[in-house]
Amino acid sequence: MASSLELPKFEPDRDRLVWYLAYGSNLSSQTFREDRQITPQAAVTITVPGWRLTLSSAGFPYREPSFASIVNVGSAGPTDEKHDGPCELPLHGTAYLITWSQWIKIVASEGGGIVYKEALLRGQPIQPQDQQRWGAELSVLTLVSTMERWPEPRPSQRYMGLILDGARAADFPASYIAQIRHKHPCYQPPSTTWERIGATLFLGFWTPVLTLLSLLTHAAARAGPGDDGHVPEGVRALVRFAMFTMWWVHDLIWSRIWGRGDGLFPGAMQLNG
């Protein structure tokens, strides 16, 4: 089983160059360069043996049920969905060459340690010209979700579109793109009047709550995320509590009355983290 490496200690030289592995929405040029406002010095398409893409990071029921994360191949988990098929391709991603200060900015923009933790992995460039320039192996920093749901909820069409557009732009193998599309069908919004009423009521309450928490998170990050990009522990605990509460209400109360907001069948979900 593959495992992550020991994370490097913070260095005062914020212009030091590091590789950052994007595998989800940051594959999209618009998300990474425009929304994150980060221009990398290089971009290399890589594979990461021993790891695979998941859509298991807890999102927002009825709107954005899940976001991307990664897991070890064959890692133990609460369901069989965490185990790979014999022919499944390993994780593909884009390694961006950025400064340490830009890496800290990414950590802060992805919630400042609330949902994701840092990991250091080894990746292999796909293209021969990249192998010749950068070597056969790269050490890459990335983020792994600490709030996962199994089986994996279905991602929104918007979010999956960002991943697929980024994968195509990075010239990922067609077989890998097909694998993503096959394994992760998109969430379909409620189709009946009853389900739409339930979704509207749920979103009407939780959207303002999550909006306020998002503003709090970004304000805490702008106020000074520190050397690691993390928000204060009190903010982290508050947001995680709200997320667990929201999904608890969805799983045990709301979905039994109005229908599920994650695209799965009744009784399917478990939130971990």
UniProtKB/Swiss-Prot annotation:
Keywords: Lyase. Its EC number is 4.3.2.9. It is an enzyme of class 4 (lyase). Pathway: Mycotoxin biosynthesis. Gamma-glutamyl cyclotransferase; part of the gene cluster that mediates the biosynthesis of aspirochlorine (or antibiotic A30641), an unusual halogenated spiro compound with distinctive antifungal properties due to selective inhibition of protein biosynthesis, and which is also active against bacteria, viruses, and murine tumor cells. The non-ribosomal peptide synthetase (NRPS) aclP is responsible the formation of the diketopiperazine (DKP) core from the condensation of 2 phenylalanine residues. InterPro entries: G-Glutamylcylcotransferase. The keyword Aminoacyl-tRNA synthetase does not apply. This is Gamma-glutamyl cyclotransferase aclK. It catalyses: an alpha-(gamma-L-glutamyl)-L-amino acid = 5-oxo-L-proline + an L-alpha-amino acid. One of its GO terms (molecular function) is gamma-glutamylcyclotransferase activity. The keyword Lyase applies. Belongs to the class-I pyridoxal-phosphate-dependent aminotransferase family.
